Amino acid sequence: MKTNILILLLGMVTSMSWAQNDITICHTPATEKFALFASNKSFNNEHQMPRAYVHVSEAGGEMITFACADGMKANAYVIMAEKKTNNWIFVFQEWWGLNDNIKKWSEDLFTEVGNVNVMALDMYDGKLATDRENAGKYMQAFKQDRGNAIVKGAMNYVGKNAKVGTVGWCFGGGQSLQAALTVGKQTVGCVMYYGMPEEDVNRLKTLNSDVLNIWATKDQWINKEVMDKFEVNMKAAGKKLTVYAYDADHGFANPSNAIFDEEAYKDSRAKTIAYFKSKF
């Protein structure tokens, strides 16, 4: 039964419709496919409960709100460079939400990359999970249309001259790639940590940057099959993909997580910092 579920979730889910004697194949969107995992107990249990952590900004980070085209407001944690710059990194949360661990990661990026502003987007609109049950509910309730509206609202906030890199983990790994697609010509880089890739080659063809893809070989969900398919699709789209695989498990890069792998974290973090430094 477990094997059948995995095949259903990770395989290509298609439906067919006939119009003028042509067959149209519809793929399950990446965000929806990843959200389906939350209905599986094994996936939820793989996410170790994060340790309590309170981040106090040393770089002047603060929460802001901005308008979105869908008529709603959005929230973000923003750290601005002392000297004005159009370089921005958009940060995307794990399935827990925009918690203090993500704010700490944002500040690390800000400090180590240099010459950038950093914006961690609240993709759950104020909801924050401290247990697996709510994390799963929030992830399943998330709609990509709303996510796209948040990213577009952020783009209006940073302006038409901004150069934007994206990074995220878990749920946010997939959102990092979706945001890179949404940002369009202003995208300069994209980093994914164990996130669900986009499968639509035609969409991938619109990417304005390469992608740095980081994943864990012990991850049962964002696994080798998923990663191999992503490589094939990026090649078909004519886009550069750099891949680093670590002998670790899903969530290894979260220092507040019991599954944290310090060696893999330090190496992947160094590669992420170097990647963004090469973009700005």
What residues fall within each predicted segment?
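Short alpha-helix in the alpha/beta-hydrolase fold that links the catalytic acid
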Residues: 105, 223-233
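Short beta-strand/loop motif that positions the catalytic acidic residue
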Residues: 207, 213-215
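Acidic catalytic loop of the alpha/beta-hydrolase fold
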Residues: 218-222
